[in-house]
Structure formats: C-alpha cells, structure tokens
C-alpha cells in the first residue's frame, strides 16, 4: 500500500521517463496540489504497467478526486492482465484520449475497472477491437416513444450501453 502522502504532483507515485509496474496493491489517501493524487506520469516515454487486482482510488487534488493523471497513452495492461475487481480512477488534462493498451480480455468490463473522474462531463471508457482504451465523450443514441397509457407525453431513452444518464427524459 502507498497511502497518506502529500506532494505537488504524484502523491503516491511520480514517474518521469521510466516505467512503474504495479501487480496488485493499493494506492489511496494521498493528496496533491497539482495533479495525480495517486499516480502521475510526467515524461514523454513514461509508462505505467498494471496487472492483477489493484486499487487506485480515494486520492485527491485538493478536495477533488484525482487518482491516476494521464497526458496520453501511458497505461499498459501487463501480460497477466487485470481482474474484474481492479479499480483505477483516471483523470486527464482535458478531453478525449487513448490512455491504455493491452485490454484484450473480452470477459472483462474495462469501463468498470477504469473509472473516469470526469463523469459529470459525460466521459466514458470505451475499448476498440485492438484492445486500446479511450476516455471519450458519451455518444447518445436517442429513441422516442409515447409514454405508456398516454397520448400526449413523449419519453426519450438513450439506448447506448455506456450511457451515464439513467433517467428517462
């Protein structure tokens, strides 16, 4: 466990151009004033290899959840892969990006493992056919229908499986 640290960035772990490998374990309860409450990768060639059942949650930038701070494709899922119980909060400088490679286990729900900390802005995790993971804005697929039992109320429902909106509009 890496816990209860305070820093300007990378409260738990700060990596420049090296590689940090984490096979299980926990990084939590760390606080920063800048970015990467749990882990930050600052260098252009820096990488973070993850596998097993690991947890990187509960780290903060001030009072805001900020666990693994990414500026690009920095995470590699190791040969042993992740378990469905792994939880990794992810933050970015802003917007959409590819953040991981090696997500090749079709039995895993990577959107439950990697938790976008920008969910209020509608960001979700998606996987392409090559095993790359992306943090991207959710794309709604709206369907419209009359509300059952009425003739004047239309309901809208997003049919996309990763939709952050759970209420019928």
Regions found by a protein language model. Name each.
Residues 6-14, 31-42, 62-72:
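Extracellular beta-strand/beta-solenoid scaffold signature
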Residues 10-12, 18, 25, 36-38, ...:
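Periodic glycine anchor positions in long extracellular repeat architectures
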Residues 51-142:
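Extracellular/surface-exposed low-complexity segments
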Residues 18, 138-169:
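Thrombospondin type-1
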Residues 1-4, 19-31, 49-58, 78-82:
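Right-handed parallel beta-helix
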Residues 36, 47, 65, 130-132, ...:
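A generic structural signal for beta-strand entry/edge sites
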Residues 9, 22-23, 35, 52, ...:
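Cysteine-rich, disulfide-stabilized extracellular repeat modules
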